[in-house]
Structures are given as structure tokens and as C-alpha cells.
């Protein structure tokens, strides 16, 4: 497998691991595209290793579960307890049962997986930074499920290399610039207020998506705020091979940070002054002015939030505490 030759990675087995972008003659950080990789062979990404990872993440509330019966149109809400109260050991013992679903969030909090994320990004770093310098805050999310299962429609702040490790899944992705799918106001609300309440799937959106039917060794790259969702159908599953495992490798850059700051300032213009400001990227000269102002707005919001939290009354400690 060809990789970014400036930074190859080698696992304990001697195998060289990486994401192969050479299948894309014109890879761009601003465009959705398919890709190939071989991280499905990495020892840390096999199901027994992931069960051990889940045991380590569970006390940190980094194992997430969805309620039964969700659809792609459901709100993307999740909890740190299984809806039936199952332990992590039981979750993995029964992971091939239809509609089983667990996500391992922020795997980078475990040092060996933080190192793995660095290896994955090193295999593409020079290609990414040709367009978007200063990669930072690399995070990882692993989704483990048995069909029929879905991940609801949503957007993320980060750019995303999405890698299929085991089983099959269909990933549907829309352009982040398609305002008929997610309005600029909804994107701003997500960036500023962390809310997905106005990011909801409608069946009329489906024809406008790019669909990727992926198996082990396949993947998809999509830019920040690209609407996306997944589904896994039962037709590929057989006893002993009925689990889908996907790895979202997320990262920020100077470009995503700049866009977020423009969204922050646009929110002030829209809500406070009733303006209809240009979205990030539509007016680069204005973005140059908005971004530092948005940085100030964001810092002020965080400070105000911290002050409000500290001012909330707390229960008095018991006598003698």
C-alpha cells in the first residue's frame, strides 16, 4: 500500500500501515472522496483489543449507547449507560445480536490509541497540510454494531477520515455547502451552541447524497460540517462475521478554526443585528476581518459561561465534612 512517504508507520507485526490517497488523483481537504487503508489489520483495532479498550473507557464515561429503535432521522442522542443496563462484558458477549450498538468516544485518552491516531494522521499529514496547515486536536471514535443498525444524520466540527475496519456499512454524505440539507443558521447553532436540534434528516435529502458501500479496508474522507449518516443491513452478516466496526479519525486545522470563528461572528450579526452575513469561504476578505472578531466573541462566551457556572448555588456539605 502506498502512503505519504514522508511518514510511514509500522506496527508490531512489521506491517506498514497507512491511508492510501493515491487512488484519488486530486485529493482535496474540501471535497468528499473514497479512500483505501489497511488499518483493519492493525492489532489494536481487532475486536478483542476493542473490548479491552471499552473496559478502560467505561469508567471515564466514554462508552456511548443509543436507545433501541432509532432511525437515520432520529436525533443523535446517546448515553453513557446501556439502555438495558448491560455491562461492557455483556455488551461484547452479545455484540452480534441484531441492532447491538456501542461507540467508543475519545479513544485518544488511552495512550496507545493516542499514539495510533498519530500514526494514522502521519500517513496523510503532508497531503492534508498542503491545503490546511496546522493539524491539531486529533480525536478518535469507534462505532461497533450488528445489523440492522444506523447512525443518525448529523454534522461534526472536524474534518474526518472514516475507516471501515470490519463488516459492511453504507455511508451517506452530503456537501457541507448544500444549504438545502442543513441551513447556514443550523450550522452556526451547532458551532456556537453545540446544538443539533435543527440538523434533521428528511427522505427528500437522500438523492443529493454521495453513498459509499464500504467493507474492511475502505473509507471515506469528508470535510468539516458535511452532513452524514450510516446504515448497516443484515444481508452480509453470517455467524461469526456479523459485526460492523468503523473508526472516525477526526482533526482540526487552521482552516476549520478560522471557519468556526467566522461562524461565531456571523451569529452575532444574524441574531443581534438581523443581518444575513456571508458564510465562511464565500467572502475571503471579509473572513479575514471576521475571524479575529469571532475569536473574541467565542472567548467572551466561554468566560460568561464559566462565570455563570461558578455562580450557581451548590449544596452545603454535611456537618463535619
Task: Give a label for each model feature.
Residues 151-154, 171-172, 222, 228-238:
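Short beta-strand His + acidic residue motifs that chelate non-heme Fe in jelly-roll/DSBH
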Residues 1-101, 306-321:
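N-terminal auxiliary "cap/dimerization" subdomain that precedes the catalytic jelly-roll/cupin core
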Residues 141-155, 174-178:
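Conserved short histidine dyad/triad with adjacent acidic residue
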Residues 21-23, 89-92, 128-132, 147-153:
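Catalytic micro-motifs at enzyme active sites that drive phosphoryl/nucleotidyl and oxygen chemistry
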Residues 18-20, 232-321:
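Non-heme Fe(II)/2-oxoglutarate
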Residues 166-221, 226-227:
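Double-stranded beta-helix
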Residues 137, 150-160, 207-208:
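A short beta-loop-beta micro-motif enriched in histidine and acidic residues
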Residues 107-142:
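A gly/proline- and charged-residue-enriched helix-loop-helix capping module
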Amino acid at each position: 500500500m502506498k502512503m505519504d512517504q514522508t511518514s510511514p508507520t509500522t506496527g508490531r507485526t512489521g506491517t506498514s500501515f497507512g491511508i492510501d490517497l493515491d487512488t484519488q488523483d486530486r485529493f482535496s481537504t474540501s471535497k468528499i472522496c473514497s479512500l483505501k487503508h489497511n488499518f483493519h489489520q492493525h492489532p489494536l483495532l481487532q475486536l478483542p483489543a476493542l473490548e479491552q479498550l471499552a473496559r478502560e473507557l467505561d469508567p471515564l464515561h466514554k462508552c456511548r449507547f443509543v436507545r433501541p429503535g432509532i432511525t437515520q432521522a432520529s436525533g443523535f442522542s446517546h448515553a453513557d449507560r446501556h439502555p438495558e443496563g448491560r455491562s461492557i462484558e455483556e455488551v461484547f458477549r452479545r455484540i452480534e445480536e441484531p441492532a447491538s450498538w456501542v461507540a467508543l468516544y475519545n479513544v485518544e485518552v488511552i495512550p496507545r490509541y493516542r499514539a495510533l491516531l498519530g500514526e494514522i494522521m502521519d500517513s496523510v499529514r503532508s497531503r492534508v497540510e498542503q491545503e490546511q496547515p496546522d493539524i491539531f486536536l486529533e480525536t478518535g471514535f469507534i462505532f461497533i454494531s450488528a445489523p440492522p443498525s444506523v447512525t443518525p444524520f448529523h454534522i461534526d466540527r472536524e474534518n474526518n477520515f472514516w475507516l471501515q475496519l470490519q463488516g459492511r456499512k453504507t455511508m451517506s454524505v452530503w456537501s457541507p455547502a448544500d444549504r438545502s440539507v442543513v441551513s447556514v443558521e443550523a450550522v452556526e447553532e451547532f458551532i456556537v451552541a453545540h446544538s443539533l436540534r435543527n440538523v434533521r434528516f428528511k427522505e427528500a435529502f437522500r438523492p443529493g447524497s454521495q453513498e459509499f458501500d464500504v467493507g474492511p479496508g475502505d473509507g471515506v474522507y469528508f470535510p468539516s460540517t458535511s452532513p452524514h449518516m450510516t446504515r448497516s443491513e443484515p444481508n452480509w452478516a453470517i455467524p461469526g462475521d456479523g459485526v460492523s466496526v468503523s473508526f472516525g479519525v477526526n482533526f482540526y486545522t487552521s482552516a476549520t478554526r478560522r471557519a468556526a470563528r467566522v461562524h461565531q461572528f456571523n451569529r452575532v450579526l444574524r441574531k443581534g443585528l438581523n443581518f444575513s452575513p456571508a458564510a465562511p469561504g464565500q467572502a475571503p476578505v471579509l473572513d479575514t476581518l471576521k475571524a479575529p472578531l469571532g475569536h473574541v466573541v467565542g472567548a467572551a462566551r466561554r468566560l460568561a459561561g464559566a462565570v455563570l457556572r461558578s455562580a450557581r448555588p451548590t449544596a452545603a456539605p454535611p456537618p463535619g465534612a
